[in-house]
Amino acid sequence: MSRPAESAIHPASNLLPGFDHKKLRTTGADINYAVGGSGPPLLLLHGNPLTHVSWHKVAPSLAERFTVVIPDLRGYGDSSKPDGGEDHSAYSFRAMAQDNVELMRSLGFDRFQLAGHDRGARVAFRMALDAPQAVSRLAALDIVPT
């Protein structure tokens, strides 16, 4: 089972007061994330070409009522950039969704609320389809249908 790494000083610390910055090795990638607050778990997924820091204006306020988890999707920010392979499956929405289900489980959250922006919303939809038992609510922001 994956385990969270120890906290480290992160350059974004001043933008996310009260958040701990950590890394987790999932099945397919090393995921950089920040976690803060207390209450029901809320996972926020950023869009393209952003990082977890894109939530810095709302995450501290949300952390007053929720345990907020904000990762860098694989390939973004300080998360690892695995080889995509010929079919690019390492960067599929399914692979990114699995990373984040593993992340939330490693933090003790088998069920959580989820919000995604842009690419993060696509990952959120995939997660709700692949792991419906994990997602209690889903909000999608700025997503273009394909």
Model-predicted segments: where are they?
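Short, hydrophobic alpha-helix immediately C-terminal to the catalytic nucleophile
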Residues: 56, 101, 125-129
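Conserved hydrolase catalytic core segment
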Residues: 65, 107-146
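Alpha/beta-hydrolase fold catalytic core
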Residues: 1-41, 64-66, 91, 110
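Tryptophan-centric aromatic hotspots in well-structured domains and transmembrane helices
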Residues: 18-21, 51-52, 119, 125-126
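Conserved HGGG/HGGXW glycine-rich cap/lid loop of the alpha/beta-hydrolase fold
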Residues: 29-82, 103
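Conserved Rossmann-like nucleotide-binding pocket used by diverse enzymes
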Residues: 20, 41-44, 69, 115, ...
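A general structural signal for stabilizing positions within well-ordered secondary structure
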Residues: 13, 60, 94, 103-106, ...
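Active-site loop/oxyanion-hole signature of alpha/beta-hydrolase fold enzymes
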Residues: 27, 70-119, 145
